[in-house]
Amino acid sequence: NRIAVIGIIVEEPQEVEKLNQLLHEYGSYIIEEWGFLPGEKDHVISIAMDAPQDTINALTGKIGRLEGISAKAVYSK
């Protein structure tokens, strides 16, 4: 397993329900989740995970395919 942080920018709030479904699906790998609202529309969310790299990549890819949501993962060495 690897430790990773996935940074998520949500620009389309109507997609948050789909995002939450994905986070629930991968919940057993999520160590911590935190976020803030810098503007009225955009959300910034960070997810810390302890999971196999393929699992982290899969979640990051699924999140990134949601309309108006961007995601990038940063891994421990």
Per-region residue spans from a language model:
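Long, contiguous binding/interaction regions
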Residues: N1-K77
